[in-house]
Amino acid sequence: MTDTKQNTRISQFRFGQPKESLKLEHVALGALDKDKVRVHIEATNINPSDLLSIYGVGQYKHSHQPPRVPGFEAVGRVIESSNAEFAVNQRVLVATSGTWQNYVDVSPDDLFQIPQYLENGYACQLYINALTAWVLTTEVTKLNQEDVLIINAGSSAIGKIFSQLSVSLGFKIIIVTSQPKRYPTTTNWILDANADLVSQIKALGLPMPTVALDAIGGSPGTNLIHTLGNKGRFINYGTLSLDFYEPRFFEYAKSQAIDFSTFFLRYWEEAEGKDVRRDKFTTMLDHFITNGIQLDVDRYLPFDEVQTAIDLIESKTTRLDGKIVLLPV
């Protein structure tokens, strides 16, 4: 039986290597603030943003100062609440920082009701990547059957979501991946990230992309923008490379009158407000369930094996077929 008086959590005490900055702690649970809901976490995943926040890269160095508990999304059950919308035993998605712990006290604004039947590994992935992909395709770009989208990081979790949404929403997609032979799709519109993209598009007789979504930045982002023609649209939504764009990126963007912008889910949330965010999540969840959008899990590991999990994610030789999901201990 779970101890509801003690909380087990993964704490971050400083920026740097996870082995030196993370520690499993057991702390007493205090009284619940009257404006919060207490959730027992059932599963929480590891995203690139989690690792960036642990290392203290970019914006995370300023917005997520240690000491803190990492983790930005999870699934769990309400165990204590004075909020009318969230009753005890209600299953919820937790969309806030600090999810790598057994219990988390959350503002109702950061909780989303979800069906009881959704598997933990699926449910805990329904926010960061899923909502980002949904908002980018349906709101920011409003893709339709006339559009040709090109994405990089095609083998990533969000890359696989874009691929599935191209089928359910009806737009065309060209996928750039460093693992073209392992890509789980029947489409022929797969490009090798290690070869010239424009040459591959021509050789395969593919249409010219109208919209590009860049998750990497740096040199890969520069290569991606060169696939767009005059007045194309280029959106950066991630910097997995941790590198800046090369000068030729901006030279090409200017010469082709390309519409360049950035997208970060947190800024979109702040601009649109909590009601819009909740409406978009509800619409997205209905679409994902109705259309069988998959969110893959490679394996489940307990909190006390978080170092093993991070080693697997950062390994140059291990190929993961989905997220590593952390489970409370």
Language-model-detected regions and their locations in the chain:
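C-terminal hydrophobic helical "lid"/dimerization subdomain
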Residues: 2-5, 40, 271-329
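NAD(P)H dinucleotide-binding glycine-rich loop of Rossmann-like/cofactor-binding domains
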Residues: 72-73, 91-153
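Short, well-ordered loop/turn sites that connect or cap secondary structure elements
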Residues: 85-86, 143, 228
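N-terminal Rossmann-fold cofactor-binding loop
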Residues: 176-180, 215, 238, 264
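Short amphipathic alpha-helix with an adjacent loop that forms part of the alpha/beta core around
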Residues: 196-207
